A protein has these predicted regions:
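Acidic, small-polar-rich N-terminal luminal/periplasmic segments of exported/outer-membrane proteins
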Residues: 25-171, 558
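Outer-membrane beta-barrel translocator/receptor signature
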Residues: 135-138, 149-226, 234-238, 288, ...
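Acidic/polar loop-and-plug regions of large Gram-negative outer-membrane beta-barrel proteins
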Residues: 209-214, 222, 226-297, 310-351, ...
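Structural signature of Gram-negative outer-membrane beta-barrels, strongest in the C-terminal barrel
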Residues: 231-235, 351, 370-372, 376-382, ...
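Surface-exposed extracellular loop regions of Gram-negative outer-membrane beta-barrel proteins
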Residues: 248-263, 383-385, 472, 503-557, ...
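Membrane-embedded beta-barrel scaffold of Gram-negative outer-membrane proteins
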Residues: 295-299, 303-309, 313-319, 513, ...
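Gram-negative outer-membrane beta-barrel transporters
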Residues: 574-579, 595-682, 723, 751-753
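C-terminal beta-signal and adjacent terminal beta-strands/loops
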Residues: 674-680, 706-754
């Protein structure tokens, strides 16, 4: 037995020493929500990596141009819903007022230049002056500086591109959000994507919402929308997408806000102005568009992308304004002041448009250089027919006031002590009847473009392009009561624009660049103003609308961009100068004006930061410091003045901190300096060296917080305008109405991932 055990004992004694145990590092798996946005930076929800416009062939951090992107995550956290609210919070952008179908500030001013017709959806111009909602938006891109080689005519200060949610084969998800809040707020949205086979997917977005305007009840907003996107990938080289977008926006008792009182140097917003909208007032937009996209790869280095869209919108409004008036006694002696209703502002606009755009990308090695060519073709046909409403008043007047043509009876909304009168919503007994058209506007455009991006060395890159637009414009005007044609105008021309940029890569994280770009616009290029020369309408000189040169803008920009913190944070800075020459000038509703007599300049610096400061802290911030000056004008008193509706300082910051796995909180702060109202592209009005129609500066603060209940549900709380600040976003040229920002509002939203 002992002998038998000896070999085992020997084996035991010679067994090797066990290897030391290796302890592997702990791997932390951070759960992230699915982000179907193909342009997003993974792990940095406030940062976009690329532009949705495929003509930008490089990431945003390598593009020698200021392009500000607001991601869908940032939009949802902020609580903003209408596109107007999103853009108003961005640096370098202000809102304007307008009429003729553009009543409420869906008019944007970028770096001091008119941009109400420079709004694009997925790269195609959206010609309707409509209310625009965010329920189907993936991200919003704002390109700063003249941009006609991409956007075509216009775009003197830049352009806005709303990128819509598209079907994808990569994920299946269903998200439902339901919110309630103060001011009778309710909002329900659906975002669902489903792949039915490995080749076909459908995405649906739906919206129903409504609320009283915070602080301005009984003014109300209602939005209902549906967006459908179907993707069919026939094979790895060919895909087809078909989209439908529909929105019904209805505002009851739309509010024109306050008005200015006093005279310079004591010109200021009136206090305690009640909501004086009449019960019959309305602002409605109905939008329907269908878009087809085809992407085909002929070869690994040759790809065609085509978009075709047909759209129509029906925009209608009838609003009532008010201003400060002098109240008279029976003997026509002044006895005080009060707010007085005006005669109303009405308009309707029927828009029909067709657009096709094709871009061919060709990556080609020529010698030692690899080129990224983009060859483009575009055809658009935009038709806008517009008119107004007849106004009937049956309400008894309640005061005697000093009018334009002397003493007259009127409707005072307050008594001499500033107290609102009774039955204010039906004071004028106002009703509206749609009249036939007064303006029939049409522009057909055929465009060709060529662009190239090429690396000269590992550090030097050149980016450039040219675009030619041949347009044919026609405008008929008529008297809608007699039916008589009052004007028939038409002309055509070709515009040539370009851009050129060069960048130097300092290291893998950062680069510096210089860029130059141009833009041109045409006489009568705004579809909503007819021959109202002071509002961007067709300018007639010596009885003719033909013969004017295009307005021309040039931009020089020097900047730097840095991709920091493992590419999760993008920091940008740029200095720029935009000069606009050959500006058409006119006054108010006058048809007669002067061709190419104006010139203005904007200089500034713009800073941006977007992404993750730490793994728990997300940030999007921007600041613009600018100075504008009228260099030449047919009106000598305008020379040297800043541009109208121009804020020389603005900034916004939105931050979110993830305190625990389930709880996050954040805030939004924005500031806009004071500005002077007036007409587009003109010097602000001054009296004795002081602004005649001032809009005060303001700061507004919002708070938000989110709590994840489980992996399928979370709650988000938004408190908008926390301090209930009275602030104003735009003023009419005469100070007769002053658009007011929303008061404090609280929203609670339940988000479900099903």
């Amino acid at each position: 037995m002992a002998a038998a055990l000896l070999p085992l004992s020997a084996i035991a004694q010679v067994q090797p020493t066990p290897a030391p145990v290796t302890t592997l590092p702990t791997v932390t798996v951070q759960e992230q929500a699915i982000d179907p946005n193909p342009n997003a930076e993974v792990g940095a929800p406030y940062k976009a990596k690329t532009s949705a416009d495929t003509r930008h062939t490089r990431p945003l951090a390598e593009t020698p141009q200021t392009i500000q992107v607001v991601t869908g995550e940032a939009i949802r956290d902020s609580g903003a819903t209408d596109l107007k609210q999103i853009l108003a919070a961005q640096p370098g952008i202000t809102l304007g007022t307008g009429e003729n179908g553009n009543a409420f500030g869906d008019r944007y001013i970028i770096r001091g230049q008119e941009a109400r017709s420079d709004v694009f959806v997925d790269g195609l111009r959206d010609p309707g002056m409509t209310t625009r909602e965010s329920f189907a938006i993936e991200q919003v891109e704002v390109t700063k500086g003249p941009n006609s080689s991409f956007a075509g005519r216009g775009s003197a200060g830049g352009a806005v591109n709303a990128v819509t949610k598209q079907a994808t084969l990569d994920y299946d998800f269903t998200r439902v959000s339901a919110g309630v809040g103060t001011d009778s707020h309710h909002r329900v949205t659906l975002d669902m994507n489903k792949g039915f086979t490995d080749k076909f997917a459908l995405r649906a977005n739906a919206l129903t919402s409504g609320e009283d305007v915070p602080g301005r009840s009984p003014s109300q907003r209602r939005r209902d929308g549906l967006a459908l996107s179907g993707l069919w990938e026939l094979n790895q080289d060919l895909s087809v997408t078909l989209d439908y977008y529909g929105l019904r926006a209805k505002d009851k008792h739309p509010d024109l806000g306050g008005y200015l009182v006093g005279t310079v140097p004591n010109r200021r917003p009136a206090t305690g102005v009640p909501v004086y909208a009449q019960n019959s007032d309305f602002l409605n937009s109905d939008v329907d568009t269908v878009t087809a996209r085809i992407a085909y790869r002929f070869a690994p280095d040759l790809k065609l992308t085509s978009l075709t869209r047909y759209g129509q919108s029906d925009n209608r409004y009838a609003t009532t304004g008010a201003s400060n008036g002098t109240v008279l006694d029976a003997a026509n002696n002044p006895i005080g002041t009060a707010g007085v209703l005006d005669g109303g502002h009405t308009g309707w606009q029927d828009v029909k448009y067709f657009a096709h755009q094709s871009n061919l990308r060709w990556d080609k090695q020529i010698g030692s250089l690899k080129h990224e060519f983009i060859f483009g073709f575009e055809y658009t046909d935009h038709k806008v027919k517009s008119g107004n409403y007849g106004v009937t008043n049956t309400g008894a007047t309640n005061c005697r006031v000093s009018g334009r043509n002397g003493p007259q009876a009127g409707w005072c909304i307050t008594d001499l002590n500033g107290n609102p009168v009774s039955n204010l919503g039906d004071l004028a007994g106002r009703s509206y009847e749609r009249r036939s058209w007064t303006r029939d506007w049409r522009v057909k455009t055929f465009a060709l473009s060529a662009m190239d991006t090429v690396d000269l060395t590992d550090q030097w890159t050149v980016f450039g392009g040219l675009r030619a637009d041949h347009y044919d414009l026609s405008l008929d005007t008529r008297n809608n009561q007699t039916g008589a044609i009052t004007g028939n105008y038409g002309f055509n021309d070709t515009l040539l624009n370009g851009h050129l940029g060069v960048s130097y890569k300092i290291n893998p994280m950062g680069m510096v660049y210089a860029s130059y770009g141009t833009a041109q616009d045409i006489n009568g290029g705004e579809p909503d103003t007819g021959t109202s020369s002071g509002y961007g309408g067709l300018v007639i000189h010596n009885g003719s609308a033909a013969g004017a040169k295009p307005e021309t803008s040039q931009n020089i920009e020097l900047g730097t961009k840095w991709n920091l913190l493992d590419d999760k944070l993008l920091a940008t800075a740029a200095v720029f100068q935009t000069t606009k020459d050959d500006v058409m000038e006119g006054a108010n509703y006058d048809t007669e004006g002067t061709f190419n007599t104006g010139k203005n300049r904007v200089r500034g610096i713009e800073l941006g930061l977007a992404g993750n400061l730490t793994k728990n802290f997300q940030l999007q911030a921007g600041a613009a410091i600018m100075k504008s000056k009228v260099l030449r004008s047919a009106v000598a008193s305008n020379v040297g003045n800043p541009l109208s509706n121009f804020a020389d300082r603005s900034f916004t910051v939105q931050g979110k901190y993830q305190l625990t796995r389930d709880f996050s909180f954040g805030a939004v702060a924005r500031y806009e300096s004071s500005r002077c109202g007036g007409q587009p592209d003109t010097g602000a009005g001054y009296t004795n060296g002081m602004c005649s129609q001032p809009v005060p500066s303001f700061s507004v603060y919002d708070l938000f917080a989110s709590y994840r209940i489980n992996k399928h549900a979370d709650l988000r709380l938004n408190v908008l305008n926390v301090t209930d600040k009275d602030y104003y976003t735009a003023v009419y040229r005469s100070g007769a109405f002053l658009y007011k920002g929303d008061g404090r509002a609280v929203r609670l939203t339940l988000n479900l991932d099903l």
